[in-house]
Curated annotation (Swiss-Prot):
The lineage of its organism: Eukaryota, Viridiplantae, Streptophyta, Embryophyta, Tracheophyta. The record marks R65 as: Transition state stabilizer. It comes from the Eukaryota. Its EC number is 1.11.1.11. Its cofactor is heme b. SUPFAM superfamilies: Heme-dependent peroxidases. It catalyses: L-ascorbate + H2O2 = L-dehydroascorbate + 2 H2O. This is Probable L-ascorbate peroxidase 6, chloroplastic/mitochondrial. Binds 1 heme b (iron(II)-protoporphyrin IX) group. It comes from Oryza sativa subsp. japonica (Rice). Keywords: Calcium, Chloroplast, Heme, Hydrogen peroxide, Iron, Metal-binding, Mitochondrion, Oxidoreductase, Peroxidase, Plastid, Potassium, Transit peptide. It is found in: Plastid, Chloroplast stroma; Mitochondrion. GO terms for biological process: cellular response to oxidative stress; hydrogen peroxide catabolic process; response to reactive oxygen species.
Amino acid sequence: MAVVHRLLRRGLSAASPLPSLQELGRRPASSSAAAAGDAAAELRGAREDVKQLLKSTSCHPILVRLGWHDAGTYDKNITEWPKCGGANGSLRFEIELKHAANAGLVNALKLIQPIKDKHAGVTYADLFQLASATAIEEAGGPKIPMIYGRVDVAAPEQCPPEGRLPAAGPPSPAEHLREVFYRMGLSDKEIVALSGAHTLGRSRPERSGWGKPETKYTKNGPGAPGGQSWTSQWLKFDNSYFKDIKERRDEDLLVLPTDAVLFEDSSFKIYAEKYAADQDAFFEDYAEAHAKLSNLGAKFDPPKGISLE
């Protein structure tokens, strides 16, 4: 992604060299010893820097994906932390970044590493979720009721095994989505609501094997051109994902098997139809589901978390 080289925001130098993948993985996890007030102030500073990064690079989709993929490895059937996976910052390590489902996410990590370096007291686990929620909000989406104070895992040996994240084209899409999301403790309503985040971003065939090399909506960027988007305005968070899947009138818009099934499965369809007709209802349910996802598997210090509001 070309935006990796456009780190123009307050306090960061565009001339600063990007760290290597190996260097990123060796960065130490942050200490949680700071007082809650100081921690909140540092988190607010990081949030402002994320906003500037979004303005200068239009990297909203990949930051959303970064937060999701760190949290989405959670297994409710495993009680031991961090073996349960989830939002613990493990995605910063090379071994997990190389999982097939995480193709391209090293670019997201390189984008936000300067923010991590500037705000050393913010954990990777918090920064990933902060960046994801902020990207949703800055793209026009709902305010996510976030809390912070997540503890980082310390070493790559604590990364979850590969295969816990959803695939795009499984043989039985509805069964696959339920297997993955039920394992996290999420419901059919939350599956459909969270799927609506595909209103942002593009699929690149060289990474996922899905989508066209380019379309009329993506051939000129912003950012690196190419890929196929789910919606025509793929940097705007709204309910057009559901409308476009339902109508299927534009061959330049992507519909994966796991997208189409939202209007084919009888339980999923209830929510997909609702969200296509009512953006406010979608925003309300999405904000709740996103916040829940961001907390999966997280260990908080302080135990009740830190609010920025």
